[in-house]
Design a protein with these regions (language model features):
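Conserved active-site alpha-helix within GNAT-family acetyltransferase domains
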Residues: 85, 101, 109-127, 132-133
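Residue-level recognition of the GNAT/N-acetyltransferase active site
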Residues: 57, 75, 79, 108
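Acetyl-CoA-dependent GNAT
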Residues: 4-64, 70, 125, 134
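Hydrophobic adenine-recognition pocket in adenosine-nucleotide-binding enzymes
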Residues: 2, 72-74, 107
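Conserved acetyl-CoA-binding loop-helix of GNAT-fold acetyltransferases
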Residues: 71-74, 80-93, 116-120
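Conserved GNAT acetyl-CoA-binding A-motif
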Residues: 88, 95-107
Length: 136
């Protein structure tokens, strides 16, 4: 699991991943300390080379909690070495310990390398459609 000492590295990796404004380290620390989010990091020689995030949800509509892997990023130089697969497995175990029985992952329809990793980890595509609306 990520710790506050990983916050600076997470800020840099998130910027590589999402672009836009770099997330302040103080905000990352606040999230790590108070959120329902599981944040996993992968390291190589004491350097954070990837991260994955997951959340669990419980609704009165369903008997069991469900989870979602919301973010997954591995530095380009560290890809194709099983890092993402290890992060997925770790997050699955964390969610399972919270009582989660099923996990969703959302990724871009053209992100073929990510889709392949998820499928190799046992995930299957379904026919759901995601809709989004920006609120002002």
């Amino acid at each position: 699991m990520a710790t506050i000492s990983d916050a600076e590295a997470l800020s840099k990796l998130n910027f590589e991943f999402n672009g836009g404004d770099k997330r302040p380290v103080s905000e990352i620390i606040k999230c790590l300390n108070s959120n329902n989010e599981c944040v996993a990091v992968a390291t190589l020689m004491n350097e954070v080379i990837g991260f994955g995030c997951a959340q669990s949800f419980k609704s009165f509509c369903y008997n069991e909690a469900y989870g979602e892997i919301t973010e997954m990023y591995v530095k380009k130089s560290a890809r194709r070495n099983g890092v993402a697969t290890s992060l997925i497995s770790f997050l699955e175990n964390q969610l399972h310990s919270r009582g989660v029985k099923s996990i969703k992952i959302l990724t871009g329809r053209d992100n073929n390398s990510a889709i392949k990793v998820y499928e190799l980890s046992g995930y299957v595509m379904d026919d759901e459609v995601m809709l989004m609306k920006e609120l002002e």
